[in-house]
Protein backbone atom coordinates (compact mmCIF):
# COMPACT_ATOMS: atom_id res chain seq x y z
CA UNK A 1 0.00 0.00 0.00
CA UNK A 2 1.05 3.59 -0.57
CA UNK A 3 2.63 5.54 2.26
CA UNK A 4 2.28 9.27 1.76
CA UNK A 5 5.38 9.93 3.87
CA UNK A 6 7.96 7.33 2.88
CA UNK A 7 6.95 7.57 -0.79
CA UNK A 8 7.89 11.28 -0.84
CA UNK A 9 11.61 11.63 0.03
CA UNK A 10 11.42 15.43 0.00
CA UNK A 11 9.49 15.33 3.28
CA UNK A 12 12.26 13.55 5.15
CA UNK A 13 14.76 15.96 3.61
CA UNK A 14 12.90 18.89 5.17
CA UNK A 15 12.52 17.07 8.49
CA UNK A 16 16.31 16.75 8.66
CA UNK A 17 16.89 20.49 8.33
CA UNK A 18 19.78 21.53 10.65
CA UNK A 19 17.50 24.05 12.39
CA UNK A 20 15.45 21.17 13.81
CA UNK A 21 18.00 20.57 16.57
CA UNK A 22 17.37 23.99 18.08
CA UNK A 23 13.61 23.72 17.44
CA UNK A 24 13.52 20.41 19.32
CA UNK A 25 15.53 21.79 22.20
CA UNK A 26 13.11 24.70 22.63
CA UNK A 27 9.91 22.69 22.21
CA UNK A 28 11.11 19.93 24.53
CA UNK A 29 12.45 22.45 27.08
CA UNK A 30 15.80 20.68 27.10
CA UNK A 31 13.98 17.32 27.22
CA UNK A 32 12.55 17.78 30.71
CA UNK A 33 9.54 15.53 30.08
CA UNK A 34 11.71 12.40 29.96
CA UNK A 35 11.53 12.09 33.75
CA UNK A 36 7.73 12.23 33.82
CA UNK A 37 6.61 10.50 30.61
CA UNK A 38 8.24 7.27 29.48
CA UNK A 39 7.46 8.03 25.84
CA UNK A 40 9.05 11.50 25.90
CA UNK A 41 12.34 11.80 23.96
CA UNK A 42 15.62 11.58 25.84
CA UNK A 43 17.56 13.77 23.42
CA UNK A 44 17.57 15.23 19.91
CA UNK A 45 18.13 11.90 18.15
CA UNK A 46 15.29 10.31 20.11
CA UNK A 47 12.97 13.22 19.29
CA UNK A 48 13.74 13.01 15.58
CA UNK A 49 13.14 9.26 15.63
CA UNK A 50 9.76 9.89 17.26
CA UNK A 51 8.79 12.50 14.66
CA UNK A 52 9.86 10.18 11.86
CA UNK A 53 7.77 7.29 13.21
CA UNK A 54 4.67 9.46 13.70
CA UNK A 55 5.04 10.83 10.18
CA UNK A 56 5.31 7.28 8.87
CA UNK A 57 2.15 6.27 10.75
CA UNK A 58 0.36 9.33 9.35
CA UNK A 59 1.53 8.41 5.86
CA UNK A 60 0.35 4.84 6.32
CA UNK A 61 -3.13 5.83 7.51
CA UNK A 62 -3.35 8.34 4.68
CA UNK A 63 -2.39 5.75 2.08
CA UNK A 64 -4.53 2.91 3.44
CA UNK A 65 -7.63 4.74 4.66
CA UNK A 66 -7.92 8.43 3.78
CA UNK A 67 -6.89 8.24 0.12
CA UNK A 68 -9.15 5.25 -0.72
CA UNK A 69 -12.08 7.00 1.00
CA UNK A 70 -11.54 10.36 -0.72
CA UNK A 71 -13.66 9.85 -3.83
CA UNK A 72 -16.58 8.41 -1.88
CA UNK A 73 -16.41 11.22 0.66
CA UNK A 74 -16.49 13.85 -2.08
CA UNK A 75 -19.48 12.16 -3.74
CA UNK A 76 -21.47 11.56 -0.54
CA UNK A 77 -20.51 14.73 1.32
CA UNK A 78 -21.82 15.75 4.73
CA UNK A 79 -25.54 16.23 5.37
CA UNK A 80 -27.43 18.76 7.48
CA UNK A 81 -30.53 17.82 9.45
CA UNK A 82 -32.20 19.10 12.61
CA UNK A 83 -29.52 21.72 13.03
CA UNK A 84 -26.65 19.23 13.05
CA UNK A 85 -24.07 17.98 10.55
CA UNK A 86 -23.61 14.32 9.70
CA UNK A 87 -20.19 13.61 8.19
CA UNK A 88 -19.82 11.34 5.18
CA UNK A 89 -19.21 7.71 6.20
CA UNK A 90 -15.64 7.84 4.90
CA UNK A 91 -14.93 10.95 6.96
CA UNK A 92 -16.06 9.11 10.09
CA UNK A 93 -13.69 6.25 9.25
CA UNK A 94 -10.85 8.72 8.72
CA UNK A 95 -11.47 10.43 12.06
CA UNK A 96 -11.65 7.10 13.84
CA UNK A 97 -8.34 5.99 12.34
CA UNK A 98 -6.61 9.20 13.39
CA UNK A 99 -8.01 8.98 16.92
CA UNK A 100 -6.93 5.36 17.35
CA UNK A 101 -3.42 6.33 16.21
CA UNK A 102 -3.30 9.19 18.72
CA UNK A 103 -2.83 11.86 16.06
CA UNK A 104 -4.80 14.63 17.72
CA UNK A 105 -3.64 17.54 19.82
CA UNK A 106 -0.26 16.93 18.28
CA UNK A 107 1.36 20.20 19.37
CA UNK A 108 -0.11 20.20 22.87
CA UNK A 109 1.93 19.36 25.99
CA UNK A 110 2.03 15.74 27.11
CA UNK A 111 0.35 16.55 30.42
CA UNK A 112 -2.85 17.19 28.46
CA UNK A 113 -2.52 14.05 26.34
CA UNK A 114 -0.77 15.69 23.39
CA UNK A 115 2.41 14.71 21.56
CA UNK A 116 4.25 18.02 22.13
CA UNK A 117 5.22 18.19 18.45
CA UNK A 118 6.91 21.30 17.05
CA UNK A 119 4.91 23.04 14.35
CA UNK A 120 7.28 21.79 11.61
CA UNK A 121 6.56 18.02 11.77
CA UNK A 122 2.92 18.73 12.59
CA UNK A 123 2.58 20.84 9.43
CA UNK A 124 4.19 18.00 7.50
CA UNK A 125 1.51 15.65 8.85
CA UNK A 126 -1.16 18.12 7.72
CA UNK A 127 0.38 18.25 4.25
CA UNK A 128 0.39 14.45 4.05
CA UNK A 129 -3.29 14.24 5.02
CA UNK A 130 -4.36 17.04 2.67
CA UNK A 131 -2.52 15.40 -0.23
CA UNK A 132 -5.03 12.55 -0.05
CA UNK A 133 -8.19 14.49 0.84
CA UNK A 134 -8.18 18.27 1.20
CA UNK A 135 -11.65 18.21 2.76
CA UNK A 136 -10.61 15.88 5.54
CA UNK A 137 -7.41 17.87 5.90
CA UNK A 138 -9.58 20.89 6.73
CA UNK A 139 -11.42 19.01 9.47
CA UNK A 140 -8.41 17.30 11.03
CA UNK A 141 -5.96 20.21 10.92
CA UNK A 142 -8.37 22.59 12.66
CA UNK A 143 -7.14 20.93 15.84
CA UNK A 144 -4.48 23.64 15.80
CA UNK A 145 -7.13 26.16 16.91
CA UNK A 146 -6.35 24.78 20.35
CA UNK A 147 -3.09 26.74 20.24
CA UNK A 148 -5.09 29.94 20.76
CA UNK A 149 -6.89 28.52 23.76
CA UNK A 150 -3.57 27.26 25.14
CA UNK A 151 -2.00 30.70 24.70
CA UNK A 152 -4.84 32.85 26.06
CA UNK A 153 -7.08 30.55 28.11
CA UNK A 154 -6.76 30.07 31.86
CA UNK A 155 -5.63 26.91 33.65
CA UNK A 156 -9.19 25.76 34.25
CA UNK A 157 -9.97 26.06 30.52
CA UNK A 158 -6.75 24.23 29.70
CA UNK A 159 -7.67 21.29 31.92
CA UNK A 160 -11.26 21.09 30.62
CA UNK A 161 -10.81 21.60 26.89
CA UNK A 162 -7.31 20.63 25.74
CA UNK A 163 -7.57 16.93 26.76
CA UNK A 164 -10.78 16.66 24.75
CA UNK A 165 -9.03 17.83 21.57
CA UNK A 166 -6.12 15.49 22.28
CA UNK A 167 -8.68 12.67 22.60
CA UNK A 168 -10.08 13.42 19.14
CA UNK A 169 -12.82 16.03 19.42
CA UNK A 170 -12.99 18.60 16.61
CA UNK A 171 -12.70 22.39 16.45
CA UNK A 172 -13.78 25.33 14.35
CA UNK A 173 -13.02 29.03 14.20
CA UNK A 174 -16.19 31.10 13.81
CA UNK A 175 -15.26 34.43 12.26
CA UNK A 176 -17.12 35.34 9.05
CA UNK A 177 -20.63 36.80 9.08
CA UNK A 178 -23.09 37.82 6.34
CA UNK A 179 -21.80 41.42 6.56
CA UNK A 180 -18.28 40.77 7.85
CA UNK A 181 -15.86 38.70 5.83
CA UNK A 182 -12.34 39.94 5.24
CA UNK A 183 -13.18 43.06 7.28
CA UNK A 184 -13.44 41.36 10.65
CA UNK A 185 -13.71 44.69 12.45
CA UNK A 186 -17.32 44.68 11.22
CA UNK A 187 -18.24 41.52 13.15
CA UNK A 188 -21.58 42.05 14.92
CA UNK A 189 -22.37 38.69 16.56
CA UNK A 190 -23.48 39.95 19.96
CA UNK A 191 -21.94 38.79 23.23
CA UNK A 192 -23.85 39.73 26.39
CA UNK A 193 -22.84 38.88 29.93
CA UNK A 194 -25.49 36.88 31.81
CA UNK A 195 -24.98 37.95 35.43
CA UNK A 196 -27.56 35.52 36.79
CA UNK A 197 -25.68 32.52 35.40
CA UNK A 198 -22.18 34.05 35.40
CA UNK A 199 -21.59 33.34 31.71
CA UNK A 200 -21.70 35.02 28.31
CA UNK A 201 -24.52 34.60 25.80
CA UNK A 202 -23.97 34.77 22.04
CA UNK A 203 -26.63 35.79 19.52
CA UNK A 204 -26.35 36.22 15.75
CA UNK A 205 -25.25 34.47 12.57
CA UNK A 206 -21.91 33.18 11.33
CA UNK A 207 -21.41 32.17 7.70
CA UNK A 208 -18.86 30.15 5.69
CA UNK A 209 -17.60 28.39 8.83
CA UNK A 210 -15.35 25.43 8.08
CA UNK A 211 -16.36 22.36 10.10
CA UNK A 212 -19.10 24.46 11.64
CA UNK A 213 -20.64 21.70 13.77
CA UNK A 214 -17.40 21.00 15.64
CA UNK A 215 -17.27 20.06 19.31
CA UNK A 216 -15.44 23.24 20.36
CA UNK A 217 -15.61 26.64 18.67
CA UNK A 218 -13.48 29.74 18.96
CA UNK A 219 -15.89 32.60 18.28
CA UNK A 220 -15.14 36.24 17.49
CA UNK A 221 -17.99 38.34 18.90
CA UNK A 222 -18.79 41.92 19.87
CA UNK A 223 -18.68 42.19 23.64
CA UNK A 224 -18.63 45.98 24.02
CA UNK A 225 -21.98 47.70 23.61
CA UNK A 226 -21.99 50.65 21.20
CA UNK A 227 -18.69 49.85 19.46
CA UNK A 228 -18.26 49.37 15.72
CA UNK A 229 -14.58 48.54 15.29
CA UNK A 230 -12.06 45.93 16.38
CA UNK A 231 -11.71 47.39 19.86
CA UNK A 232 -15.12 46.03 20.77
CA UNK A 233 -14.38 42.41 19.85
CA UNK A 234 -13.49 39.53 22.14
CA UNK A 235 -12.75 35.84 21.61
CA UNK A 236 -15.06 33.26 23.14
CA UNK A 237 -15.13 29.50 23.61
CA UNK A 238 -18.38 27.74 22.72
CA UNK A 239 -18.86 24.09 23.68
CA UNK A 240 -21.40 22.22 21.54
CA UNK A 241 -22.42 20.22 24.61
CA UNK A 242 -23.99 23.41 25.99
CA UNK A 243 -26.36 23.79 23.01
CA UNK A 244 -27.67 27.01 21.53
CA UNK A 245 -26.09 26.90 18.06
CA UNK A 246 -27.81 25.35 15.04
CA UNK A 247 -26.45 24.69 11.58
CA UNK A 248 -28.87 26.38 9.20
CA UNK A 249 -27.30 24.96 6.05
CA UNK A 250 -24.15 23.60 4.43
CA UNK A 251 -22.80 25.62 1.52
CA UNK A 252 -23.06 24.01 -1.93
CA UNK A 253 -19.43 24.23 -3.04
CA UNK A 254 -17.72 23.33 -6.30
CA UNK A 255 -15.27 21.04 -4.51
CA UNK A 256 -13.77 19.90 -1.19
CA UNK A 257 -17.22 18.55 -0.36
CA UNK A 258 -16.05 16.43 2.56
CA UNK A 259 -15.46 19.54 4.66
CA UNK A 260 -18.80 21.07 5.76
CA UNK A 261 -18.82 24.84 5.29
CA UNK A 262 -21.72 25.99 7.43
CA UNK A 263 -24.03 28.84 8.28
CA UNK A 264 -24.55 28.93 12.05
CA UNK A 265 -27.32 30.53 14.08
CA UNK A 266 -26.44 31.47 17.65
CA UNK A 267 -29.50 31.63 19.90
CA UNK A 268 -28.52 32.74 23.39
CA UNK A 269 -25.66 30.24 23.27
CA UNK A 270 -23.67 29.89 26.48
CA UNK A 271 -19.99 30.76 26.04
CA UNK A 272 -16.95 31.77 28.04
CA UNK A 273 -14.33 34.41 27.45
CA UNK A 274 -10.97 33.27 26.10
CA UNK A 275 -8.44 35.69 27.59
CA UNK A 276 -9.11 39.38 28.15
CA UNK A 277 -12.00 41.37 26.71
CA UNK A 278 -11.52 43.65 23.70
CA UNK A 279 -8.52 41.69 22.41
CA UNK A 280 -10.40 39.41 20.02
CA UNK A 281 -8.56 40.53 16.88
CA UNK A 282 -5.19 39.95 18.52
CA UNK A 283 -6.22 36.40 19.37
CA UNK A 284 -7.47 35.97 15.80
CA UNK A 285 -4.04 36.92 14.44
CA UNK A 286 -2.48 34.40 16.82
CA UNK A 287 -4.90 31.72 15.67
CA UNK A 288 -4.38 32.21 11.95
CA UNK A 289 -0.61 32.19 12.39
CA UNK A 290 -1.08 28.47 13.05
CA UNK A 291 -4.10 27.58 10.92
CA UNK A 292 -2.72 29.32 7.83
CA UNK A 293 0.29 27.02 8.01
CA UNK A 294 -1.84 23.89 7.76
CA UNK A 295 -5.05 24.81 5.89
CA UNK A 296 -3.26 25.84 2.64
CA UNK A 297 -1.68 22.39 2.44
Specify the residue positions occupied by each region the protein language model found:
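Amphipathic, small/basic residue-rich leader segments at the start of a protein or domain
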Residues: 1-136, 156, 160
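Flexible, glycine/threonine-enriched loop-and-boundary segments that flank and lead into catalytic domains
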Residues: 84-93, 106-107, 174-194, 205-207, ...
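Extended, hydrophobic alpha-helical segments in both membrane/secreted and soluble proteins
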Residues: 104, 108, 116, 121-125, ...
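Internal maturation/activation junctions in enzymes
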Residues: 141-142, 153-189, 193, 198
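Short Gly/Pro-enriched turn/cap motifs at secondary-structure boundaries
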Residues: 179-182, 208-211, 227, 253-260
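A short core secondary-structure module
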Residues: 199, 203-245
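A glycine-rich, basic-preceded beta-loop-alpha segment at the flavin cofactor/substrate interface
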Residues: 241-248, 263-290
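Conserved small/polar residues in nucleotide/adenosyl-binding loops
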Residues: 291-297
Amino acid sequence: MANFYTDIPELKYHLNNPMMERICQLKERDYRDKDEFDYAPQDYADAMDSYDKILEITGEITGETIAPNAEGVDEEGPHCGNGRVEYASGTKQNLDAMVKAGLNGMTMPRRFGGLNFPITPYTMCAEIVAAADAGFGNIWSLQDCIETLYEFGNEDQHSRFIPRICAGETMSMDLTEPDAGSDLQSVMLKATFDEANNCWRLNGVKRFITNGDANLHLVLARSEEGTKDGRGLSMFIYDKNEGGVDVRRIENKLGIHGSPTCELVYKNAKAELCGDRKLGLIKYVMAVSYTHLTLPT
